[in-house]
């Protein structure tokens, strides 16, 4: 079973992430940041990952530390659940539309952290959520999961739709990349023999 639980405690946040990469999309989310919970729900449902996230952070200041640290802890949990990466497909991509918005996400479990985030948001906030925090979430994930991640919003007018298509596409790309390939069972998906 590809499951993991990671706890991260700092002076700013206390985070717990538990996941099952081979789940059905069940989720239990309580980050204290409602829009982040909504986006994590997209990852769980579209990635078919069972996901529990509990977070307590200094949201009286703002949501930055909570959002970033949830990304970090989720990245650590995914890396732990995958383990040595034997048999995974490694690469995943997805295009997801939502009305006028369309986003593309491509991921590589390369072991080389890298983020290309190109989302021309049409406004700075979605409700009380600062859209710039989405970059911090994905940067935290990338650096701790050891992945290369390309995120492109190709079109969109509604910022909520823009970001929701990003998170849905991320969930679907993640699902494809961590899927086990029976034909490559026990093999590292690299000509180097390691990732």
Curated annotation (Swiss-Prot):
Q: Kindly give the SUPFAM superfamilies that the UniProt entry links to this protein.
A: Ribosomal protein S5 domain 2-like
Supply the alphabetized keyword list: Amino-acid biosynthesis, Cytoplasm, Histidine biosynthesis, Lyase
Q: Which InterPro entries match?
A: IGPD_sf (IPR038494), ImidazoleglycerolP_deHydtase (IPR000807), ImidazoleglycerP_deHydtase_CS (IPR020565), Ribosomal_Su5_D2-typ_SF (IPR020568)
What domain of life is recorded for the organism?
Bacteria
Give compartment(s). Answer: Cytoplasm
Q: Pathway, per UniProt?
A: Amino-acid biosynthesis; L-histidine biosynthesis; L-histidine from 5-phospho-alpha-D-ribose 1-diphosphate: step 6/9
Q: Which GO terms describe its biological process?
A: L-histidine biosynthetic process
Annotated HAMAP family: HisB
Instruction: Report what the protein is called.
Output: Imidazoleglycerol-phosphate dehydratase
Q: Name the principal localization, coarsely classed.
A: cytoplasm
Q: Which GO terms describe its cellular component?
A: cytoplasm
What sort of enzyme, by top EC class, is this?
Answer: lyase
Could you cite one Gene Ontology molecular function of this protein? imidazoleglycerol-phosphate dehydratase activity
Q: Give the family this protein belongs to, as stated in its UniProt record.
A: Belongs to the imidazoleglycerol-phosphate dehydratase family.
User: Which Enzyme Commission numbers does its entry carry?
Assistant: 4.2.1.19
The record's Gene3D superfamilies line, in alphabetical order, gives: Imidazole glycerol phosphate dehydratase, domain 1
Matches recorded under Pfam families: IGPD
Parts forming coiled coils: none
Q: Which reaction does it catalyse?
A: D-erythro-1-(imidazol-4-yl)glycerol 3-phosphate = 3-(imidazol-4-yl)-2-oxopropyl phosphate + H2O
């Amino acid at each position: 079973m590809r499951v993991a639980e990671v706890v991260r405690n700092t002076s700013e946040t206390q985070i717990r992430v538990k996941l099952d990469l081979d789940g059905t999309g069940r989720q239990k989310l309580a980050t204290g940041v409602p829009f982040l919970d909504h986006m994590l729900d997209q990852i769980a449902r579209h990635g078919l990952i069972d996901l529990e996230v509990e977070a307590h952070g200094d949201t009286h200041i703002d949501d930055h530390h909570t959002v970033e640290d949830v990304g970090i802890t989720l990245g650590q949990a995914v890396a732990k659940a995958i383990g040595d990466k034997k048999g995974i497909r490694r690469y995943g991509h997805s295009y997801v539309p939502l009305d006028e918005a369309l986003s593309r996400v491509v991921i590589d479990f390369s072991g080389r952290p890298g983020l290309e985030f190109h989302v021309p948001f049409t406004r700075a906030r979605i409700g009380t959520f600062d859209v710039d925090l989405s970059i911090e979430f994905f940067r935290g994930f990338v650096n701790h999961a050891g992945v290369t991640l390309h995120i492109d919003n190709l079109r969109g007018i509604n910022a909520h739709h823009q970001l929701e298509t990003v998170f849905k596409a991320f969930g679907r790309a993640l699902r494809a990349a961590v899927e086990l390939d029976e034909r490559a069972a026990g093999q590292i998906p690299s000509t180097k023999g390691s990732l």
